[in-house]
Amino acid sequence: MPELSQNLVFIGGGHSHAIALNLWGKQPLADVNVTLISNVRHTPYSGMLPGYIAGFYCFEEVHIDLEPLAKFARSRFVLDRAVGLDLDNRRVICGDRPPIPFDVVSIDIGSTPATIATPGAADYAIPAKPVPQLLHHWSELLDRVQAEPNRRWRLAVVGGGAGGVELILSMQARLWRLLPPGDRAALEFHLFQRGCELLPSHNPYVRTTLTRLLGDRGIHLHLGETVSGLTREGGAIALQCASGFCVACDRVFWVTQASAPEWIARSGLATDAAGFILVGDTLQSLSHPEVFATGDIATMQNHPRPKAGVFAVRQGPPLDRNLRLFLQNRPPQPFRPQTQFLTLIGTGTGRAIASRGAFGCGPNRLLWRWKDRIDRKFMQTFR
């Protein structure tokens, strides 16, 4: 009697899933029906997004087209949002279509900056994630600046980690190239960091170098300032800090601590205090072994790491391996993520700074060319 086929469902087109689907296409398992659910067809590669913002890459160069990737993996592609899990009946609840059954499900949907706790942020701030929303607002801003080159533009970024620093440097560099030198004085940039140090997770060399670079480029750095609210005042956004400091802005970009969608915790999966899925060393949910999770949406209980794209990329191959083992009723193998990792932070001007543990160097063009080569090589695997 032939074995019944099994249903493997991927929720989200994040880095880990893109890698796993690519590997699956090269060596598919028989009698497994694969489905990819994503609310977007084109998924961004986070490593190249600052370069895209800065104008070094086009849209196609920094996005993976999920439809042909799913086809290569012999998978069904469903363009829809997952809004819940029925774990008792093993079904994915979708926004616009009937539930999709699964025997095994993997979740890699990223995260969004936590804006809910700050009054007005959900209404007036532009979160760095979801990325398609960020890129829509960025494209609209570029059009407005080109249409009104003599107007004063005041832009703020909230969040002084690597993501916020790289974003504001990339935005400034792109807008500078867009405008004649005489009009650049109309651009005003502010970076807000709650702590008293920029890039607190990086070494002193990187912190000092980037703090100096922001100053050299005329970006106003506000350390020790907690943004307490955003309000609309006339045609501007009033950014208010707990200290009483206030700045009028035209756009506010939000690049702060990550948060998880509420449906994850509502589903009944074990989560950490922030609502991210708790997984073990095999990338399986601690409460439901038929559920795997990777990337920002997952927290490895024994090896907590920052919410960074490098970890999602590294989780791709072990996720593929363990999904195969689980589907074959074999024990999945543990995965231990690296404790230190190399970060290459772009300045928006064709230079980059390297940071790894206590090591730091740059900025220089050689590091940017190295970063560009690494990123292009990664994206080439999906062409």
Question: Which residues fall in each region the model found?
Answer:
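A Rossmann-like FAD-binding core segment of flavoenzymes
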Residues: 77-80, 84, 173-280
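Glycine-rich, N-terminal phosphate-binding loop of Rossmann-like dinucleotide-binding domains
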Residues: 13, 109-110, 256-257
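FAD-site-proximal beta/loop scaffold in flavoenzymes
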Residues: 123-149, 246-314, 321
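Beta1-alpha1 glycine-rich phosphate/pyrophosphate-binding loop at the start
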Residues: 2-76, 166-201
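FAD-binding core/adjacent interface of flavoenzyme oxidoreductases
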Residues: 1-5, 74-156, 253
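C-terminal auxiliary extensions adjacent to catalytic cores
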Residues: 4, 349-383
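Rossmann-like NAD(P)H-binding beta-loop-alpha module
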Residues: 138-186
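A conserved FAD-binding loop/helix module that cradles the flavin
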Residues: 297-347
